[in-house]
């Protein structure tokens, strides 16, 4: 009986594998999706948001680590900016409780910032404060 059950299970597995080989390709993926997203064009929401930054730091969607490239802004001022959002414009940062020195620093680097609508994919949890990248 065990031998018969073993043979039947093997035959069922083999038949399933053979059926998978003869199925038309439309069963596996929608042709419209395959044509729409061919090659490296597949992107998710976070990738699109990052591409919209145009090389600038997005004040609504960037972590504090992105401010390291601006001397004097990381970590104190970067933390204030990240926690103070969301912003409608870059100049909204000036409404934060910043010292005169911090306001001067922000004015110095102002052209390096942009504002896009907040994305849940980039703002979930505390990833903007601690994105888990350690040296």
UniProtKB/Swiss-Prot annotation:
GO terms for biological process: photosynthesis; photosystem II stabilization. Keywords: Electron transport, Membrane, Photosynthesis, Photosystem II, Signal, Thylakoid, Transport. The keyword Zinc-finger does not apply. It holds the Pfam family PsbU. Disulfide bonds: none annotated. It is found in: Cellular thylakoid membrane. InterPro entries: PSII_PsbU. Residues 1-29 form the signal peptide. Transmembrane segments: none annotated. One of its GO terms (cellular component) is photosystem II oxygen evolving complex. PSII is composed of 1 copy each of membrane proteins PsbA, PsbB, PsbC, PsbD, PsbE, PsbF, PsbH, PsbI, PsbJ, PsbK, PsbL, PsbM, PsbT, PsbX, PsbY, PsbZ, Psb30/Ycf12, peripheral proteins PsbO, CyanoQ (PsbQ), PsbU, PsbV and a large number of cofactors. It forms dimeric complexes. One of the extrinsic, lumenal subunits of photosystem II (PSII). PSII is a light-driven water plastoquinone oxidoreductase, using light energy to abstract electrons from H(2)O, generating a proton gradient subsequently used for ATP formation. The extrinsic proteins stabilize the structure of photosystem II oxygen-evolving complex (OEC), the ion environment of oxygen evolution and protect the OEC against heat-induced inactivation. Belongs to the PsbU family. This is Photosystem II extrinsic protein U. The gene is psbU.
């Amino acid at each position: 009986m065990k031998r018969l059950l073993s043979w039947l299970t093997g035959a069922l597995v083999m038949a399933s594998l053979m059926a998978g080989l003869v199925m038309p390709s439309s069963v596996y993926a929608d042709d419209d999706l395959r044509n729409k997203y061919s090659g490296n064009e597949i992107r998710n929401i976070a990738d699109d948001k990052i591409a919209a930054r145009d090389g600038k730091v997005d004040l609504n969607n960037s972590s504090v680590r992105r401010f390291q490239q601006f001397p004097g802004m990381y970590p104190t001022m970067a933390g204030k900016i990240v926690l103070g959002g969301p912003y409608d414009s870059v100049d909204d940062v000036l409404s934060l409780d910043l010292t005169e020195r911090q306001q001067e620093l922000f004015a110095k680097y102002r052209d390096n910032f942009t504002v896009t609508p907040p994305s849940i994919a980039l703002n979930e949890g505390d990833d903007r404060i601690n994105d888990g990248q350690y040296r």
